[in-house]
Structures are given as structure tokens and as C-alpha cells.
Swiss-Prot record:
Signal peptide: none annotated. Keywords: Ribonucleoprotein, Ribosomal protein, RNA-binding, rRNA-binding. Belongs to the universal ribosomal protein uS5 family. The N-terminal domain interacts with the head of the 30S subunit; the C-terminal domain interacts with the body and contacts protein S4. The interaction surface between S4 and S5 is involved in control of translational fidelity. The keyword Plastid does not apply. The lineage of its organism: Bacteria, Bacillati, Bacillota, Clostridia, Eubacteriales. This is Small ribosomal subunit protein uS5. Residues 11-74 form the S5 DRBM domain. One of its GO terms (biological process) is translation.
Amino acid sequence: MARIDASGLELQEKVVYINRVAKVVKGGRRFSFSALVVVGDGKGHVGFGLGKAGEVPEAIRKGVEDAKKNLIVVPVVGTTIPHPALGVFGAGRVLLKPASKGTGVIAGGPVRAVLELAGIHDILTKSLGSNNANNMVRATMEGLRSLKRAEEVAKLRGKTVEEITG
């Protein structure tokens, strides 16, 4: 899959999680930080990145750089997704279900950040398994990556959209 050029997009960023880790050395503890960041344009492009550094702002900057390298295109139909999907990463599983207009984003913290920046306004989600922010963000991204529009499925099967939708 071709990499998406982030320079032409107006990306917003959201810090999902900041973690402080300690390395114990002879003189005491050395602290460093990792930041899980999600970026998106609200029009179907979204990505996530993990940045690690000795200071929080530097970790966030690195996370944003990484997120811009991992952008994906999400097929948005109106204000929701085309069909239900299950995203899995490690022990984290996230169920994504399309919702009617006016429902809003029914999702927990890390999942909500990804969906809002992807430009999805009506969706139902359920976190199954791990509640680790990293696993949930990655599982959500896998679920969004697995989505296909009816036109794409029809083309793959060599049929018309009417034949597939019934």
C-alpha cells in the first residue's frame, strides 16, 4: 500500500497516553517518557505513532512524526462506517458497528480519539479484552484498515453493487 503524503493534509493531533518509565542505574533512577499520539484530518485520514524521549514534549513530537508515517484512509459513508468490523491487536479487540445519524461516537478514550480524528461522527464500539491504550488504538486501526466500500467489494467479486447489497 502506498504511503500517504501528510504534507498536503491539515492534520490535528491528540495525545492519547503518556507513560513515564524508570531505568534503575547505580546513581538512582533514570526517567524517560513515551507518548502515544493519534493524528487525523477529520476527512478519512488517520494514523498513530509512539514517541520515546527523555522529555515529554520531545516524546510527543516524535510520536507525531511517527503517526504521519502511518496514515491510513478510512472509508467513511456519510457520517459512519460501511459495515461492522472487529479489530484485533494482541489481547485487545475492538468491535466497530455503524450507527444511524445523530447517534454520536459511543466509544472509550483511546478508541474515541482515533474515530474522531478519522472523521467518523456516528458509530458504536465495544472494547473486548485488553484495555491497554496502545493495544486499543492499534486494534481500532486494524478494524478501520479492514473496512471496504460496497464498490470495492463489487469490483473484487466482478459483480455490481446491486447484486451485493441485494
